Amino acid sequence: MDIKKLLKHVPWALLGILGAFCLAVVALRRGEHVSALWIVVASVSVYLVAYRYYSLYIAQKVMKLDPTRATPAVINNDGLNYVPTNRYVLFGHHFAAIAGAGPLVGPVLAAQMGYLPGTLWLLAGVVLAGAVQDFMVLFISSRRNGSSLGEMIKEEMGRVPGTIALFGCFLIMIIILAVLALIVVKALAESPWGVFTVCSTVPIALFMGIYMRFLRPGRVGEVSVIGIVLLVASIYFGGVIAHDPYWGPALTFKDTTITFALIGYAFVSALLPVWLILAPRDYLATFLKIGVIVGLAIGIVIINPELKMPAVTQYIDGTGPLWKGALFPFLFITIACGAVSGFHALISSGTTPKLMANETDARFIGYGAMLMESFVAIMALVAASIIEPGLYFAMNTPPAGLGITMPNLHEMGGENTALIMAQLKEASAHAAATVSSWGFVISPEQIMQTAKDIGEPSVLNRAGGAPTLAVGIAHVFHKVLPWADMGFWYHFGILFEALFILTALDAGTRAGRFMLQDLLGNFVPFLKKTDSLVAGVLGTAGCVGLWGYLLYQGVVDPLGGVKSLWPLFGISNQMLAAVALVLGTVVLVKMKRTKYIWVTVVPALWLLLCTTWALGLKLFSTNPQLEGFFFMANQYKEKIAAGGADLTAQQIANMNHIVVNNYTNAGLSILFLVVVYSIIFYGIKTWMKVRNIDGRTDKETPYVPVPEGGVKTSSHH
């Protein structure tokens, strides 16, 4: 071992020691004031060391990436779907596609157990499972002409598991879209400022699309500056309009109204050409995403806030007010996207590999973008932990959990205002008393004052994680840049999240439409035609109708839809990740690299253990704390039967909603179990079949060398 080689590793070893020291401080300090800075430094050190060593090991030993091999983008370069793209541009594109609302919401919900469990899982999960899955799927797909996950399972394991996987992917897509839409609805309900600002993004995106296509083609920088100026203006004018005596009440909508508006919007936008609304919004969202997260990290370094949430709360036993379930397995399902996410397998196959200019970029894009997403999740966890824990619980606990009834805020205006304000005052007093009795002291005045600071009528009943994160962002940005008030920064946070989510909703509805056309095309060939308007309208209507139904059920759920849909989303998302890792294992076995399969088998087994355990509990547990699907449905059926004439029509309707939701969730859960375990069965069957065959049996496309003179990359796509 020569000295030069050894010296190269010294800075990395020091970085590792620094990360370990910071993590130890985060983990072991109790009762003292812990700065949020420890978490930020620990995370960055872990990411850098993991990227330098573990991802390099996977690239060189497990995959043996080959820089001389031409990628699908180079071989099939058609200027449309296959375009060799600059690696930094593609990193931004890929990151924008994978970082939906998951890394923003899951960690905020997980903070009810304290900041420590979430931090540890986000770091360990991404290094050993999440980034490995993204990297692996991107590599396998780029060696199969950019095939989608379902197609690759079909090629490597057979037609039956391929069709099952397609079906499973589509179902998971529907749940993801319903959950994403639910978060937007919860953030915009009863919020005129939010409604105005988020609705403004549609004409802004359309204007940018037309500007880039016809007025000034190719001027990406110029149009992005105009877009950002218009966005900031929309936040400012949103505040003016919200306080207007006429427009304020006129733009205050009920959650069901926003639900139907969103369903209509998604249907139309999925049928429009990509350049008109999707691409420009993608640019805006990517600038905003990376800008806000980097800004938040710098803000935390400048103001060095203290973590107010305890490291571990009493709720690790599973009795938390936001969601029920003990630390194992439920924490690993609540934090879906920052640590590991199956949804990424749908982006890393089919979309990104068709744009990759060189095979060696897969490490930077596959492993690197997932580390970036984990950092987003860490920032969300920190933002939720630096606000008062009492405020955190008051905002996120459903009204029923606080023992309060929320007044109808959309009826504000005129003579009703004083009455509703009095009701809000009473609700805040109740909420403060309840939360304080749990050991997180807060006064009714603090709850009312926070609402006033952020320019909203109330902060109660703001579940879904988005408003909490926006309050955290507002706290940091307001201290660093005090010229703008808290209301501006809060709505800036809401806009940031809504843009994140609407981009994912647009792209997801498009992808879901193609999946449905693919699935139904097996039975009715005409529906497979992606260029046919009729088939497109039918596919889009089917996709939007399915997630719209789940969304509506979640919105009218009296127990708060996030509570019922989020566990299902987390479980299905992690199961899809397990399916992707099973495919990775099968491909490694067929490539005769069996000695490395621990890289994919270990995370796959862990995910299967967590998801199966959680689903078993959610389906069959009779513990009232856990709110199991069948248990809840039966309980409410009995209540309806026993209540008889004493129940009002509204109460019966509410109870029926709960029964329907629980049966829907149970049905979907059983379907997921069947999908995942049948794919594992076929995976093992394939392994047995190829075990004794000499030589490789995988379906990789033949080797084509990189053209002489290198590859020209595009910097905009």
Q: Model-found features: residue ranges?
A:
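Membrane-interface "cap" regions at the ends of multi-pass membrane proteins
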Residues: 1-16, 49-104, 286, 325-326, ...
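Membrane-interface helix-loop-helix modules in multi-pass membrane proteins
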Residues: 24-30, 35, 82-144, 155-159, ...
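Extracellular loop-to-transmembrane helix junctions
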Residues: 32-52, 56, 110-140, 195-205, ...
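Flexible loop linkers connecting adjacent transmembrane helices
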Residues: 56-83, 109, 123, 132-161, ...
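Helix-loop-helix module between adjacent transmembrane segments
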Residues: 92-98, 125-145, 149-223, 230-262, ...
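Loop-to-transmembrane helix boundary motifs in multi-pass membrane proteins
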Residues: 156-174, 366-378, 463-465, 483-493, ...
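Hydrophobic alpha-helical segments and their helix-loop junctions in multi-pass secondary transporters
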Residues: 190, 209, 213, 229-260, ...
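Extracellular/periplasmic helix-exit of transmembrane alpha-helices
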Residues: 300-316, 371-472, 507, 551-557
